[in-house]
């Protein structure tokens, strides 16, 4: 812009100079032609010199023309001088502006270089972050595989008729096991109670032994039943929804000791109806199985959140740098 401005000023000065010089030359040419014509007239007609008045008039007219020409030349020179002074005064201002703009351009170049360096560092950081994220993903997949190959036994219930068949099989398998557990517990309590409370009688009194033992067995059975009902009321079945199995639900029930399995969310209503329809068999010692906690889940979640936050910060920083560059 400033180079064009200086070029325009120079061109205007040249045009003014050439126009004024051409005017001066034209005025000199006119005077020269007039003088030449008069000189030719005087040489052609030398006899016509009778009137001195005419000669005086011619000389006066020539002097007048010369004075007018000189005045025109002076005015043109004054105009040229004023215009040249204006140009001379404008040139340092133009130089100052060009210096200022050159400094601003240098500052912008330095900023652009700094921004390019920052962009290079940010790209390197992003690439390193991508590599770290890939490594974390690999670790997460390895941990998921380790968790999948753990000792948890999952019982999958498919859709349709197979689900009903599997529930019936479970009912058949669980019911005899619960009955065996209850009978074994009652037998153990009876055997433990007999040597303590029953006195030793001779072999001939078998009928009396039966009579004396039967009320004790009845009281033990009643106590066992009451304790089992209390424990059953305290230890209710728990339902755990695991984050690793998004569509599977782990059910832990107290019926017949320890037994747990995983059930699909779509088959949960059918399973609840089956549980309500089956007879209630109270166990001897109910046990509530707590949820297994994986120690790597919290660490993985924290690492992923940190990586995502760092990636968002770097992306925001790059966007701000781009906005600054576009503004500049």
UniProtKB/Swiss-Prot annotation:
Ranges where the record places region Disordered: 186-205
Coiled coil regions in record: 122-151
Modified residues (Phosphothreonine): 182
Annotated signal sequence range: none
Stretches with biased composition (Basic and acidic residues): 186-197
Keywords: Coiled coil, Phosphoprotein
Protein name, as recorded: Coiled-coil domain-containing protein 54
Organism: Macaca fascicularis (Crab-eating macaque)
Gene coding for it: CCDC54
